[in-house]
Design a protein with these regions (language model features):
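Hydrophobic, structured segments
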Residues: 148, 161-162
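Conserved catalytic cores of very large enzyme subunits
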Residues: 1-135, 156, 162-166, 170, ...
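Contiguous, well-ordered alpha-helical segments that form the cores/surfaces of helical PPI scaffolds
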Residues: 139-152
Length: 250
């Protein structure tokens, strides 16, 4: 039906699992996606492992707990952080830690206000009627612009390799994600108990005002590898860092 109607809405995501989803149905979904850019495909096994059976998809690929939600989504614009750095060392030791700390504190305060002062969870009809539960909420620690960040840092180090096409550049991207992941794992928020007291890392797609900022950890449009398998291999290096979702377009 969607293939014939070509509707722009609603947004549809299929929880895809090789052990559950019939191949013929999966193929029909691919054919529909090629016509309408939906459904999106969610890795059901991975989401289930990270969030449990009772997870849902919000928007196109945001994994959150059923009956919960995200207090807030803030994002690191990594390319802009790299522009502040004198070199790779300065980026890792000073610029990135500073911005992550500021963003985490900002998120903490937003969450504290929502829970302790706003009265939302006491007065909103969704909470009063049992559709949402405060103790199932978390928050999304987002990022965009990995490609620009890596390319800027490579240039600062006098190297020509580019994100998505050079092993050293891609390794640098992984190193950046390891630093972000370590910071998030060390930061505790008392109202994110549903996710172990931590925010969920999220590869954000972007907003309308973004210019020259590549979504999440994607390779910039027009610079994709010639072979699809190479792009898939590249994606696989970053997928594991984002329990609340990451996505790509092929």
């Amino acid at each position: 039906v969607e293939r014939e109607l070509l509707d722009a809405v609603p947004n549809i995501t299929m929880k895809y699992d090789t052990d559950i989803t019939p191949d013929d149905f999966g193929i029909e979904c691919v054919k529909t996606a090629l016509k309408t850019a939906k459904p999106s495909f969610a890795n059901h096994k991975m989401f289930k492992k990270e969030l449990g059976e009772n997870y849902v998809i919000a928007s196109c690929y945001n994994g959150l707990l059923l009956g919960g939600g995200s207090y807030t989504l803030c994002r690191l614009i990594l390319g802009n952080i790299a522009k502040r750095a004198k070199d790779k060392k300065d980026f890792f030791e000073n610029q990135l830690p500073y911005v992550m700390e500021r963003m985490a504190l900002y998120m903490d305060e937003r969450i504290r206000f929502e829970v302790e002062e706003s009265g939302f969870f006491e007065s909103n009809f969704l909470a009063k009627e049992g559709f949402i539960h405060r103790d199932r909420f978390t928050a999304m620690f987002g990022m965009v612009g990995m490609a620009e960040c890596v390319n800027i840092l490579m240039e600062l180090e006098g190297k020509k390799g580019r994100f998505g096409h050079d092993k050293e550049a891609d390794d640098l991207g992984v190193e950046i994600m390891e630093a972000i992941n370590a910071f998030n794992n060390a930061h505790v928020n008392p109202y994110c108990e549903a996710t172990g007291g931590h925010f969920l890392l999220h590869a954000q797609v972007g907003i309308a005002q973004d210019k020259n900022i590549t979504p999440g950890t994607r390779i910039p449009i027009g610079e994709e590898p010639k072979e699809l398998i190479d792009q898939l291999r590249h994606c696989s290096r970053f997928h594991k860092y984002f329990p609340s979702g990451t996505g790509d377009i092929f």
